[in-house]
Every structure is written in structure tokens, then in C-alpha cells.
From Swiss-Prot:
GO molecular function: FAD binding; oxidoreductase activity
Function in brief: Has no cannabidiolic acid synthase activity.
Record has Flavoprotein as a keyword: yes
Domain FAD-binding PCMH-type: 77-251
Active site per database record: 484
Species in which this protein is naturally found: Cannabis sativa (Hemp)
PTM (free text): The FAD cofactor is bound via a bicovalent 6-S-cysteinyl, 8alpha-N1-histidyl FAD linkage.
Protein name according to UniProt: Cannabidiolic acid synthase-like 2
One GO cellular component term: extracellular region
């Protein structure tokens, strides 16, 4: 009896020892365990292409930094992923999700790397990046005027391939050609056709999403609630979106543009701005008139160097030169628009003109530039956004513009972008993006610089401007745009039982009354909150399910 008891105790002790040892090994080597698991889904002998990178690989840092668009997040102290996967197909995404979940690693999904806070490639806990660079096909169906776009495709690739198939079709999305469709579409996505057709997210008709269980869902199998949520509510909250089906829209064979510079005393400039903010949102959908401001050094008539504010009034008009000049002279004669200020361009050349990748004086555009994923010169940047519902008083506008003088020359910029058009006609609950009727324009506050040691200086300038404009923009809540993510609005503490209460503070700024519906969807499809970041949609606590 004694021997039997002793033997049982001894065997249990040995089993406990080995279990403890294995648990310690598992905890100590999450990367090793992840790679072992992943080998079942991405066998190394299937393709010559390298799809998985660890910190010991020669090209790890070049892959990591290749699409980091904000150089604030390339320092040695920036958290780095244990592993980067670059899937070729949905099965590779499935494997990455299941293996990350199995070993307790977080996932960050990167499409184009333009996340303003770097949250598509940074985490404060051990994590894996799913980099979708290899999944960038764009398949056009001209007959149905639709396209399937993989989430690793850039906006430039989308515009290029649509135009290759039909010059009178396009898609309502952003200006920057290197922005990835994965994040841009799922956060809303506005651009040159916003007043005509709404956001990118308004024109998505299906999607392929890999959920927390590794299942691939389309619109029918995911259900309308989840399909609603991923169009403007941030797809990364609910899974990894592999592809989008988009509705293509009609564009004119030719459009007319101008971008005129106004260099004048600030009080005279503010009179123009005041006229603009009272009229730009009221124009018909066919005309987009926006303006931006930046400081430049000039030499005055006495040969002295001085810093001044340059303002640019820019347009896209779905019509001819004569019609645009006539319209501007009747509605906004103070701008003094002449025929010589205008250019007639094809739609694809209009996109290139405002893409930021060509010189404004260029007229010989090559659309292949839209396929260049490198994006040219990169910089550190910070950006915030406000929505304006009523005209800002001239005295306040003077102070706002003068704040550009408080920043280094050429670093700070403001963009005023009009609403109106079809945006007034779409319900604020049609998709999670709620910013619709009642908004007259947006203000983008931007700082872009080169030296990382100046990060805090420039970020603080943006914060100062943002604080000053508080009384003049949307209120209760002060609204924000998910694609210009802003961690100053708040972060979620995942260890806190009150993370819903914390998230509601910033969540209602991004989503308004749609926030609670997003929480309900999250609770249903990802109750354990596997897909999360500092500003992710939280599930309700278990007691509320």
C-alpha cells in the first residue's frame, strides 16, 4: 500500500515537472512555437518566395520599414514584431491568425503603412505583422462595373487598372497613390469624388474577411451587421480583410482643374477664406473647391527675406474651361480665375495631378507612376482633423492662420476641404462613418518634418493649434476621423474592467451614435477581443452578453 501510494506520488511529480517545463518553454519561446505552428500553413518548400521574416533574417528591417510611411516610428526604440508574414493567399492569413491565437501573440495588419499613429505595425506587447504587400490584385469587370480588390493593393494600383479597362470609370477614394486599400476602405476613405459618390466605404458591395476562428467569410456568410461594421468601423477590429468588391463609378472624359496661389497680407487672405467657407459646400456636386495654407520664405520688393503664408485654391470640375471660369466669376469673383489658370485633363491625369507625386507644372503625365509603391520621399508627420459646422469668425481665422508662423517654415500646413453634395444625402447610420449632413468642411492640421529629434516640438505645435480651434469646430462630441487616427483622444487599457467606458470617449468621436452598434458586433464576432489595439472596438464584458 505504501509503495503504491509512493509510486503514484512520484509519477505525479514527474508528470507535473515535465508539464511545468513544457509550459515554461512555451512561454519562453512564443516565436519558436509560432513558427512551428505556421509551418503547417506556409510550408517552406511550396514556393521560392520568402514569406516569413524574423529578426534574425537579413531582410527583416528592410521589409519592416519599406512601407512605414511615418518616420516617427522607425527609431531603435520603436517596438518591433517578432515575425513578419507576407501572405500570398488567404490560407496564409488563416494560418497566421490561428497560430498567433494559439501561442498568445498579437496581430497587426498592414496594407500600405499610412496609419498616422503607426498602429498597423506597432504594439506594446509581443506581436506579429501580417503585411499584405503580396496580395494586391485588382480584377475589373467592366460589364457589371465592379472590381475585386485585394487589401494589399494601393489606391494607385486601383486607379491604374480601372483606367486600363475603361477611361470613363473610376472609384471614389483618396488622393495618395501609395495608401493601401485595406485600411483606407475600412476607415471610410474620401477624396476627389466624395461630393459626387460619397466615401470608398459607401461603394463597397462585398468583402472577404478572415475571422478570429480562421474562417473566410463573404457578405452573405458574415451577415449584414458585420458587413456594415467593416465599412467605416475599422476592419482590423473584426478580422483581416483579404479583399473588397467595389462599385465603380462614372467619370467624365475630361475634367477642368486649377490651382492658383494667393500671396497676400493675412487680413486680405482671411476675406477670401471667409467667402470660401460660406460657399464651397453649397456648390453643385460637379465642382470641388478646396484650399490649403503653408509658410514659405520669399524675397520682397526691397530684396529682404521674409516668411509669408502661401494659400492655394484648387478645383476639380466635371465640365469645360468656359463653364468653370463663368461659374467662378459669378460665384467667387474675388479669386479672379482666368482661362489661363485652368487645365483640361483626363480623369486619370487629374488623379495624378493631385496625387502629390508630380510637379504642379508638369503636363506630360505617365500613369505608370501610380504603380510605384515606394512613394518617393518619406518624412515624420503628425496630423489631426476637425469638422466645421458653421463659419469660423474672421478674427479667429486670422489667429488660426497666424499659428503657421509659430512652426518652422514649410513644416506646418492646413487644408480646408468642403463637404456638401451627396454627403448631405447619406444617413449617418448607413455605415459606421457618421459625419454627414450639417458639416460644411473639414480642417486637416498637418506637420511634416525630417529630424526625429524634433518630434515632440512639432507634435506639440499641432496640439496647440488643435486646442485653440476647440470653440469653432464640432461639439459634443468633437468629431474625429478614424483614418486620421489620433491617440491623444484616448487609449484603451485592456486590463481594466472599464475598457468599454474608456473606449466610448474616443469611440463616439469617431463613430457618433454608431459606436454602440459596433460594440455589439464586436461582442458577437470577437468576444475575447483577440483583434485589438489601443483604439480598438471593445466587446462588452461577459455579464452584458
Amino acid at each position: 500500500m505504501k509503495c503504491s501510494t509512493f509510486c503514484f506520488w512520484y509519477v505525479c511529480k514527474i508528470i507535473f515537472f515535465f508539464l511545468s517545463f513544457n509550459i515554461q518553454i512555451s512561454i519562453a519561446n512564443p516565436q519558436e512555437n509560432f513558427l512551428k505552428c505556421l509551418s503547417q500553413y506556409i510550408p517552406t518548400n511550396v514556393t521560392n518566395a520568402k514569406l516569413v521574416y524574423t529578426q534574425h533574417d537579413q531582410f527583416y528591417m528592410s521589409i519592416l520599414n519599406s512601407t512605414v510611411q511615418n518616420l516617427r516610428f522607425t527609431s531603435d526604440t520603436t517596438p518591433k514584431p517578432l515575425v513578419i508574414t507576407t501572405p500570398l493567399n488567404v490560407s496564409h492569413i488563416q494560418g497566421t491568425i490561428l497560430c498567433s491565437k494559439k501561442v498568445g501573440l498579437q496581430i497587426r495588419t498592414r496594407s500600405g503603412g499610412h496609419d498616422a499613429e503607426g498602429m498597423s505595425y506597432i504594439s506594446q506587447v509581443p506581436f506579429v505583422i501580417v503585411d499584405l504587400r503580396n496580395m494586391h490584385s485588382v480584377k475589373i469587370d467592366v460589364h457589371s462595373q465592379t472590381a475585386w480588390v485585394e487589401s494589399g493593393a494601393t489606391l494607385g494600383e486601383v486607379y491604374y487598372w480601372i483606367n486600363e479597362n475603361n477611361e470613363n470609370l473610376s472609384f471614389p477614394a483618396g488622393y495618395c497613390p501609395t495608401v493601401g486599400t485595406g485600411g483606407h476602405f475600412s476607415g471610410g476613405g474620401y477624396g476627389a469624388l466624395m461630393r459626387n459618390y460619397g466615401l470608398a466605404a459607401d461603394n463597397i458591395i462585398d468583402a472577404h474577411l478572415v475571422n478570429v476562428d480562421g474562417k473566410v467569410l463573404d457578405r452573405k456568410s458574415m451577415g449584414e451587421d458585420l458587413f456594415w461594421a467593416i465599412r467605416g468601423g475599422g476592419g482590423e477590429n473584426f478580422g483581416i480583410i483579404a479583399a473588397w468588391k467595389i462599385r465603380l463609378v462614372a467619370v467624365p472624359s475630361m475634367s477642368t482643374i486649377f490651382s492658383v496661389k494667393k500671396n497676400m497680407e493675412i487680413h486680405e487672405l482671411v476675406k477670401l477664406v471667409n467667402k470660401w467657407q460660406n460657399i464651397a459646400y453649397m456648390y453643385e456636386k460637379e465642382l470641388l473647391l478646396f484650399t490649403h495654407f503653408i509658410t514659405r520664405n520669399i524675397t520682397d520688393n526691397q530684396g529682404k527675406n521674409k516668411t509669408t503664408i502661401h494659400s492655394y485654391f484648387s478645383s476639380i470640375f466635371h465640365g469645360g474651361v468656359d463653364s468653370l471660369v463663368d461659374l467662378m466669376n459669378k460665384s467667387f469673383p474675388e479669386l479672379g480665375i482666368k482661362k489661363t489658370d485652368c487645365k483640361q485633363l483626363s480623369w486619370i491625369d487629374t488623379i495624378i495631378f493631385y496625387s502629390g507625386v508630380v510637379n504642379y507644372n508638369t503636363t506630360n503625365f505617365k500613369k505608370e507612376i501610380l504603380l510605384d509603391r515606394s512613394g518617393g520621399r518619406k518624412a515624420a508627420f503628425s496630423i489631426k482633423l476637425d469638422y466645421v459646422k458653421k463659419p469660423i469668425p474672421e478674427t479667429a481665422m486670422v489667429t488660426i492662420l497666424e499659428k503657421l508662423y509659430e512652426e518652422d517654415v514649410g513644416v506646418g500646413m492646413f487644408v480646408f476641404y468642403p463637404y456638401g453634395g451627396i454627403m448631405d444625402e447619406i444617413s449617418e447610420s448607413a455605415i459606421p462613418f457618421p459625419h454627414r449632413a450639417g458639416i460644411t468642411y473639414e480642417i486637416w492640421y498637418i506637420a511634416s518634418w525630417e529630424k526625429q529629434e524634433d518630434n515632440e516640438k512639432h507634435i506639440n505645435w499641432i496640439r496647440n493649434v488643435y486646442n485653440f480651434t476647440t470653440p469653432y469646430v464640432s461639439q459634443n462630441p468633437r468629431m474625429a476621423y478614424l483614418n486620421y487616427r489620433d491617440l491623444d483622444l484616448g487609449k484603451t487599457n485592456f486590463e481594466s474592467p472599464n475598457n468599454y467606458t474608456q473606449a466610448r470617449i474616443w469611440g463616439e468621436k469617431y463613430f457618433g451614435k454608431n459606436f454602440n452598434r459596433l460594440v455589439k458586433v464586436k461582442t458577437k464576432v470577437d468576444p475575447d477581443n483577440f483583434f485589438r489595439n489601443e483604439q480598438s472596438i471593445p466587446p462588452l464584458p461577459l455579464r452584458h452578453h
